[in-house]
């Protein structure tokens, strides 16, 4: 047996060993068992690094033995997939960076394109590579790369349909449609500012000393979050919906300006550039990942993103994470789903037999109500009797209206034994006013969205308005009043962001110096992510209270439990003045009562 044969056999054995380990890690649950997951990841990562190093050291002999370029691309793709899966388990930024580095190298070195392959199996590998790279670029917020990948991916699917006419590529066409729809829904105002926590926008020098000095009797650390949404026909890509994507981004750190360098995306298929594709090059600049990582930032809170979970699976994940939650920590649960009847948008409400009612100032969309409203009747103290914990619910199910698909307020009560920050975004969110047990922090969305332009009210096209306010308040404000990014330049929006930033700084001082701030809020105020959510809630509530007619206030206003101080209520002159400044700056003050 020649030396080349020995090298080839060793290489194949390493491939098989790594793939077996990869299969075991891929099938592990994404949630819980941190130590076990870390150990398993380390083993499979070590196997692939050994394989990668071996092919680099023996590349010439492997090429002589018939190694194809796409085989190197498949190994790199597996490593990228491994990193991405670990990112989804841990939310550690370095893993999404490493995944991006490997996928970008595959694309730039054209591992799947070096030879015109007519093998259907290889084409499917290439299609899967593009789909995975699209998801990584989306989460990594690489807009230029996304645009390039969508164009490449679309052409690849069309080429596969032409060359493999007997094969059905309908599923891949749906993938193309999904990403195009997602990017269309998320493209407005994308250049204003990142959704992630950014020191430039979210750390306010004026109020920083007050935040630094603030100390409650008990301080909780934000460690874990569960994010899920379940609506009919909602905007999504792969297993990431638009609402959960926005929340994911909102709960991560944005590196400082010197990081995430905007390397130009230049991969011209027809430029004639002298790129050597004759050999199976396996060199990837793994040091580039260090250039994309900001070592000054603390770790991201771990996020468990559930795609269309069953109620039993959702409860099981909550229980697992509660069990593993470190002492003196708090868990955030974000639930976006339709209420009682499984109605997910305004157009469905109107088709359900409801009557229309326009606002007095003709600003609000004509949002219909059901003649027999499902809004629960609450007692004077804003709560319900314990027998009502299982009367209203969120709806997690593909069809029908059966009990197994219903998540009741009472289902959450056992988990309030641990500190809980609960965000309910639903047309039946106020049912969770009945939630009892240990006191939890609650944000409950309005029962109805409010827009100047009725077409914007369709959550299946634009996502939830409440979630948008919590994750991108200026963009949500502009969408509500029908103000588009084409209406003005970047400096104009930068000034609008400064108005919001100044307001948030003022409100931070109020919260940090308030003597009436409930302990539930005080114990999380030191956390930058949760504090930012509180400030954005204050903004959202005041905006909607001034935008909506008073007789419909309960339908269109969000609720927080327990109450925040009166000094940051919608009736506060200081809070209203902030909305006034923003509305005047954008030239939309006539849409708000008491502002003109």
Model feature map: region roles:
Residues 1-50, 56-57:
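N-terminal alpha-helical scaffolding segments that mark the starts
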Residues 25-30, 80, 85-91, 134, ...:
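Short coil/turn linking the two alpha-helices of tandem helical-hairpin repeats
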Residues 98-226, 230, 502-541:
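Cytosolic small-GTPase signaling regions in large eukaryotic proteins
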Residues 244, 251-331, 349-352, 374-375, ...:
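Functional beta-strand-loop-alpha-helix junction segments that form "active/interaction loops"
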Residues 14, 21, 76, 83, ...:
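TPR repeat positional signature
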Residues 341-474:
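Cysteine protease catalytic core and zymogen-processing segment of caspase-like enzymes
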């Amino acid at each position: 047996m020649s030396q080349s044969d020995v090298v080839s056999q060793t290489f194949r054995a390493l491939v098989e060993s790594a793939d077996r380990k990869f299969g075991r890690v891929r099938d592990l649950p994404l949630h819980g068992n941190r130590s076990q997951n870390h150990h398993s990841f380390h083993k499979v990562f070590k196997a692939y690094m050994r394989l990668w190093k071996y092919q680099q050291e023996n590349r010439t002999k492997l090429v002589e033995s018939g190694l194809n370029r796409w085989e190197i691309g498949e190994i790199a793709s597996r490593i990228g997939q491994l990193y991405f899966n670990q990112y989804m388990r841990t939310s550690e930024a370095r893993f999404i960076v490493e995944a991006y580095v490997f996928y970008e190298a595959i694309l730039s070195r054209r591992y799947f394109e070096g030879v015109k392959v007519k093998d259907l199996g290889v084409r499917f590998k290439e299609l899967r590579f593009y789909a995975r790279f699209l998801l990584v670029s989306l989460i990594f917020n690489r807009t230029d790369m996304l645009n390039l990948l969508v164009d490449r991916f679309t052409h690849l699917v069309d080429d596969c349909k032409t060359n493999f006419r007997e094969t059905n590529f309908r599923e891949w066409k749906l993938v193309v449609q999904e990403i195009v729809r997602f990017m269309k829904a998320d493209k407005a105002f994308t250049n204003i500012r990142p959704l992630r926590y950014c020191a430039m926008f979210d750390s306010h020098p004026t109020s920083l000393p007050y935040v630094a000095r603030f100390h409650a009797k008990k301080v909780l650390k934000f460690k874990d979050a569960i994010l899920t949404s379940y609506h009919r026909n909602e905007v999504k890509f792969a297993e990431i919906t638009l609402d959960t994507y926005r929340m994911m981004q909102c709960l991560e750190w944005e590196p400082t300006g010197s990081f995430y360098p905007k390397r130009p995306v230049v991969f011209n298929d027809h430029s004639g550039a002298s790129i050597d594709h004759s050999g199976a090059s396996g060199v990837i600049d793994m040091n580039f990942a260090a250039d994309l990582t900001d070592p000054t930032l603390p770790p991201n809170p771990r996020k468990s993103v559930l795609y269309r979970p069953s109620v039993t699976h959702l409860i099981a994940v909550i229980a697992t994470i509660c069990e593993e939650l470190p002492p003196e920590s708090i868990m955030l649960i974000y639930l976006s789903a339709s209420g009682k009847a499984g109605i997910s948008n305004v157009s469905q409400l109107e088709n359900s037999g409801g009557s229309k009612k326009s606002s007095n100032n003709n600003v609000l969309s004509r949002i219909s109500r059901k003649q027999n409203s499902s809004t629960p009747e609450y007692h004077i103290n804003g709560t319900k009797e314990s027998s009502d914990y299982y009367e209203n619910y969120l709806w997690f199910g593909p069809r029908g209206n059966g009990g197994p698909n219903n998540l009741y307020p009472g289902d959450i009560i056992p988990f309030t034994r641990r500190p809980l920050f609960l965000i309910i975004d639903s047309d039946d969110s106020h049912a969770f006013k009945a939630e009892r047990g240990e006191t939890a922090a609650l944000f409950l969305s309005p029962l109805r969205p409010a827009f100047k332009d009725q077409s914007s009210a369709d959550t299946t096209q634009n996502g939830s308005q409440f979630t948008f306010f919590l994750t991108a308040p200026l963009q949500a404000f502009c969408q509500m009043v029908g103000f588009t990014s084409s209406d003005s330049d970047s400096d104009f929006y930068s000034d609008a962001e400064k108005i919001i930033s100044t307001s948030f700084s003022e409100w931070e001082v109020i919260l940090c110096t308030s003597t009436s701030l409930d302990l539930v809020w005080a114990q999380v105020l030191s956390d930058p992510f949760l504090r930012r959510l509180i400030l954005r809630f204050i903004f959202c509530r005041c905006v909607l209270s001034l935008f909506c007619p008073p007789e419909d206030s309960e339908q269109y206003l969000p609720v927080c439990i327990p109450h925040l101080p009166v000094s940051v209520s919608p009736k506060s002159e200081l809070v209203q003045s902030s909305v006034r400044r923003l509305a005047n700056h954008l030239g939309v003050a006539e849409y708000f009562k008491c502002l003109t």
